[in-house]
């Protein structure tokens, strides 16, 4: 049984991890003025687009997910031949059209694949499962890493599916934006109310940073802390405590809206690296997706892991 894993480009995972595990990326296109980039999780392309466009006018960006037809074509031209079963893991459907597009495409794919597979010499049926990760950015990485791990172990499709659906319900994605004015301007552009309870002007004047949590599809502020670096340190410290308590998978994903050297220099990051090493947890760090950056702003920090239900505490 050849099992394929598909994610959308909002999923924060390192480029080499994606390549090593043959993870297929559905690109999300970002348009800022006349500049357009289809995000294929290329960190250099993301950083140069960030310098050129996102920092100044990112809040005006329009993001376009892969359409129903594009998803159908990708599957029928490639994936129904390369794989027997595909897991398609998407950003929370409350945040993007991708889940709905993939679901819609799946009906056409399952209708039309047989002659294509037969021509390629495969007589067995093809199946796919679209799973809402109920999360975003670094949080999305957790289910994808687990899918790759279970596939490498030779687990069955049924075992993998059950595990991923359970994991999605227990994945936490924490984020700290660096610039509240940006966040408010972006929310206004999108008509998004989820950051409404933050007074951006007041927050910026007092250097207050919200800690946003994505959990079971919902994104909301769970704390307000002072200063970006102290806030990052508190989030790393909280993650270390969760690692010591025991995570549900041996993985922590970190996404950063800029050069990774800046992430490494943040207070508390070395302690997080040490805790991961001590407890046998894989720390996967990546430049945040372009979609992530235009939505939460340059220099934002995101941390994802799976754990039993808990409240955030600084």
Curated annotation (Swiss-Prot):
Chain positions recorded as hexadecanoate binding sites = 63, 96
- Which Gene Ontology molecular function entries are recorded, alphabetically? lipid binding
What keywords tag this UniProt record?
Answer: Lipid-binding
Name the domain of life this protein comes from: Bacteria
Q: Where is the DegV domain?
A: 3-307
Transmembrane segments annotated in the record for this chain:
none
- Check the record and name the InterPro entries matching this protein: DegV, DegV_C, DegV_domain_contain
Q: Name one Pfam family in it.
A: DegV
> Do you know which PANTHER family this protein is assigned to?
DEGV DOMAIN-CONTAINING PROTEIN DR_1986-RELATED, FATTY ACID-BINDING PROTEIN TM_1468
Function comment: May bind long-chain fatty acids, such as palmitate, and may play a role in lipid transport or fatty acid metabolism.
Put simply, this protein is called DegV domain-containing protein XAC3508
């Amino acid at each position: 049984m050849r099992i394929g894993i598909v994610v959308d480009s909002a999923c924060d995972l390192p480029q080499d991890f994606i390549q090593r595990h043959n993870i297929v990326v559905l690109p999300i296109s970002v348009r800022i003025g006349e500049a357009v980039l289809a995000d294929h999780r290329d960190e250099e392309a993301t950083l140069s687009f960030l310098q050129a466009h996102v920092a100044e006018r990112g809040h005006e960006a329009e993001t376009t997910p892969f359409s129903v037809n594009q998803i159908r074509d990708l599957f029928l031209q490639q994936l129904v031949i390369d794989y027997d079963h595909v897991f398609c893991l998407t950003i929370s459907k409350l945040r993007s059209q991708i889940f709905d597009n993939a679901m819609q495409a799946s009906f056409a794919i399952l209708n039309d694949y047989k002659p294509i597979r037969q021509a390629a010499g495969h007589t067995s049926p093809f199946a796919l499962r679209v799973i809402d990760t109920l999360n975003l950015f670094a949080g999305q990485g957790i289910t994808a890493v687990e899918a790759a791990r279970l596939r490498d172990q030779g687990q069955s499709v049924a075992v993998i599916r059950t595990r991923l659906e359970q994991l999605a319900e227990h994945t936490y994605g924490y984020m700290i934006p660096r610039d509240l004015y940006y966040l408010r301007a972006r929310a206004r552009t999108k008509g998004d109310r989820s950051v409404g309870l933050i007074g951006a002007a007041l927050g910026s004047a007092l250097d207050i940073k919200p800690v946003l949590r994505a959990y079971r599809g919902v994104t909301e502020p769970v704390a307000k802390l002072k200063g970006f670096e102290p806030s990052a340190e508190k989030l790393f410290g909280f993650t270390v405590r969760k690692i010591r308590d025991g995570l549900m998978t041996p993985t922590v994903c970190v996404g950063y809206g800029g050069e990774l050297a800046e992430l490494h220099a943040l207070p508390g990051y070395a302690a997080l690296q040490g805790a991961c090493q001590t407890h046998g947890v894989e720390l996967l760090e990546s430049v945040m997706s372009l979609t992530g950056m235009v939505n939460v702003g340059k220099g934002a920090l995101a941390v994802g892991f799976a754990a039993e239900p808990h409240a955030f505490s600084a």
